[in-house]
Design a protein with these regions (language model features):
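A short helix->beta-strand "capping" segment at the edge of beta-propeller domains
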Residues: 2-26, 53-56
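Short, solvent-exposed loop/turn segments at conserved positions within beta-propeller repeat blades
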Residues: 79-80, 124-131, 168-170, 285-290
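Loop/turn-rich, solvent-exposed surfaces of beta-rich toroidal or solenoidal domains
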Residues: 260-295
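A short beta-strand motif characteristic of beta-propeller blades
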Residues: 16-23, 56-61, 94-99, 141-147, ...
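WD40 beta-propeller blade core
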Residues: 48, 86-87, 135, 173-175, ...
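Blade-level signature of beta-propeller repeat domains, shared across WD40, Kelch, NHL, RCC1
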Residues: 308-369
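Hydrophobic beta-strand positions that form the internal "hydrophobic ladder"
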Residues: 38, 77, 115, 163, ...
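Repeated scaffold domains used in trafficking and secretory/extracellular systems
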Residues: 26-32, 64-74, 102-112, 149-160, ...
Length: 369
């Protein structure tokens, strides 16, 4: 069943529901939460860290840029930047190590024993990525293994100590990398992979350029077609949710395989906190102005719509918190308890007054003083 979203509700702003707003210099490239710390990096090369409870800036560093992707564990932030991958101590912002790669650094994922990183080379003659590499780096910063890939990896997941990569042209399909080499596997769906993630139960999910989704469990794959445009964004938990270039948001079979149609291409989609005990799904789209939507994951019913003046380009969520980074460099944090409390006070039929909005801005500023 296809539903329309965002056509009947009076809309509050993202700022109205944000318990913390901070800035990173330039367009946001990534945002993450690690424990009680909020970290973000920008296309211009800035990386900063704030304490979530107080809002205080803990540290800020500047790199050449652009930053592109990040992952973390309890001690370190790992992020790709230009042709390098960095390991930064979360507690201090000090750099533990930096490894220079070949080509542009792309994706990074942390495993129990190493850090997997992908890089690629763009061929201007064919207007596509012709070469790629995958790197296995230990926690001391030593490169343990490197392998060349046919084309660029558009998704990267850690699975049982190996790297799982979703590939675009010319190979398509996916690859499994380990120190013994790279194994290429074909899928029933032959179109390029545009997104991918790992399910909590260990399965791997890939989104394709034609709107199909392939789910792999125990070496057995199944494919479903959701539309005729590319999968643009994807998130995984116990099930999966995807956003299409056409504006469709859809879920996996265990969540009912429902669909919602937004007004424009989906920029980000993520599981996150909700207004009730059922997990929420958040997604954003853009059409001269931004729309951020919260829906019930079980049936796809719209719970909340927020406006934002700048395009959302990055997102990260935990059970209790969701963070959005926009193209202007602003980071907005929504916490579950604050979300529920303000929803009760800010009904969709009553937009917050200018005076109340300014007061909230002052409170957020004091939180970081």
């Amino acid at each position: 069943m296809l539903r329309k979203a965002g056509v009947h509700m009076t809309v509050s702003s993202l700022t109205d529901y944000s318990s913390l707003v901070r800035e990173i210099g330039g367009e946001c490239a990534f945002v993450r939460v690690s424990g009680e710390l909020l970290v973000s990096g920008s296309k211009s090369g800035e990386v900063a860290c704030w304490d979530l409870s107080s809002g205080k800036e803990m540290w800020r560093s500047r790199f050449e840029g652009p930053c592109s992707n990040a992952d973390s564990n309890k001690d370190f932030l790992f992020f790709t930047e230009s042709d390098r991958v960095h390991a930064i101590m979360l507690s201090s912002g000090d750099e533990a190590w930096c490894v220079e790669l070949e080509g542009s650094s792309d994706l990074v994922r942390v495993s129990s024993e190493c850090v997997w990183v992908t890089s690629s080379v763009y061929n201007f003659e064919i207007q596509d990525y012709s070469e790629g590499s995958v790197w296995k780096i230990d926690y001391s910063g030593k490169v343990r293994w490197r392998g060349d890939t046919i084309g660029r990896a558009w998704s990267l997941s850690d699975f049982q100590g190996k790297a799982i990569m979703g590939l675009s042209r010319p190979k398509c399909g996916y690859a499994i990398a380990s120190e013994t080499g790279i194994e290429y596997l074909e899928l029933e769906e032959k179109k390029p992979i545009t997104a991918g993630c790992k399910l909590d139960g260990g399965g791997i999910v890939f989104g394709h350029s034609n709107g199909s989704v392939t789910e792999i469990y125990g070496g057995v794959s199944s494919t479903v077609s959701l539309g005729d445009s590319a999968i643009r964004s994807m998130d995984c938990g116990s099930s999966w949710v995807v956003g299409l270039d056409s504006g469709v948001v859809s879920t996996g079979k265990s969540l009912g395989s429902w669909k919602i149609e937004s007004f424009e291409s989906i920029d980000v989609v993520s599981f996150g906190p909700s207004l009730d005990d059922v997990a929420g799904i958040w997604y954003s789209s853009w059409n001269d102005k931004g729309g951020i939507f919260l829906v019930d994951s079980s049936i796809g019913s719209l719970q909340l719509e927020l406006s934002h003046e700048s395009r959302i380009v990055a997102c990260f969520a935990t059970e209790h918190t969701i963070c959005f980074g926009d193209i202007s460099g602003c980071i907005h944090v929504i916490e579950k308890e604050v979300l529920r409390r303000r929803f009760g006070r800010l009904p969709e039929t009553d937009i917050e007054s200018g005076r109340e909005s300014e007061l909230r801005k002052k409170i957020r500023a004091l939180r970081g003083a």
